[in-house]
Amino acid sequence: MKDILIIAGPTAVGKTDISIKIAQKMNGEIISADSMQIYKYMDIGSAKVTKEEMKGIKHHLIDVVDPSEEFSVASFKKMAQNAIDDITSRKKYPIIVGGTGLYINSLICNYDFTGAYKDEAYRESLQAIAKDKGKEYLHEKLKNIDIDSYKKLYPNDLKRVIRALEVYKITGKTISELNSNVDLYDIPYNIHYFILNMDRQKLYERINLRVDIMLRNGLVDEVIKLRDMGYNSNMQSMKGIGYKEILSYLEGCITLEEAVELIKKGSRHYAKRQLTWFRKDERAVWINKDIYKNDDDIVFKILSSIEEI
């Protein structure tokens, strides 16, 4: 059974620096589990790790999808599994790093992403309803038949809301019911799972500062370039935090100051949702960064914990 290390946590908590230091000590390579860093050309708004920051550590699943393409959890799982096989075949250690909980869970939980249940016509009808009556209407519709999915998903998660409705229409069962007979932790990996966290107010301050740095580093110009390349707000990639707000500014819907505040607010709310998601997995070891002097102490703690297992 292959060993994999997972370093997760909310946005701006400092996963990148710590994971690279760990990779250097473990002869490891990093697999990004980030739903925005997967896209090409979207560097500043996704806080994508730079070549200099990588410090010679090979990174996988960064800059592999064109922003015009839809990218699913199933696609991530397949690509990440291939990367794990590649890394281990070269006697190196796979390190999964990111904050997209569903991406991480696709690897460390026994989820079915085969897409066996499909009804294209019904799916298209739901998309038409969403366009006519709004995303919130479909989200409320989900409440009556799949309360678990309703609580997990937000109205803006339209693709997954429609998927939950589609599965119920075909099978008469919710996604949770279909997975209830499956051993959730029956996976082909031996996992070492660590979640970085810190005082909430400190985290929010780091998030606000990161957004300010993104603006100084040219976020507006990056979005202008993407728009000029033909990418628009209807695309999955351009609905990411930081991109949709700047697009609204460029379209004259809001001021730049309003866009910046929306990015900060959206990022803080996203961090809160990430923490809620990660708390669901009892296998994870939480690392409170506030009690350590520096990142090197955290790296030592994680490496020591792995050796003890």
Swiss-Prot record:
This is tRNA dimethylallyltransferase. It comes from the Bacteria. Residues 34-37 are annotated as: Interaction with substrate tRNA. Keywords: ATP-binding, Magnesium, Nucleotide-binding, Transferase, tRNA processing. Pfam families: IPPT (PF01715). InterPro entries: Dimethylallyltransferase, IPT, P-loop_NTPase. Substrate binds at residues 11-16. Monomer. GO terms for molecular function: ATP binding; tRNA dimethylallyltransferase activity. NCBIfam families: miaA. Belongs to the IPP transferase family. The keyword Cytoplasm does not apply. ATP binds at residues 9-16. It comes from Clostridium acetobutylicum (strain ATCC 824 / DSM 792 / JCM 1419 / IAM 19013 / LMG 5710 / NBRC 13948 / NRRL B-527 / VKM B-1787 / 2291 / W). It catalyses: adenosine(37) in tRNA + dimethylallyl diphosphate = N(6)-dimethylallyladenosine(37) in tRNA + diphosphate. Its EC number is 2.5.1.75.
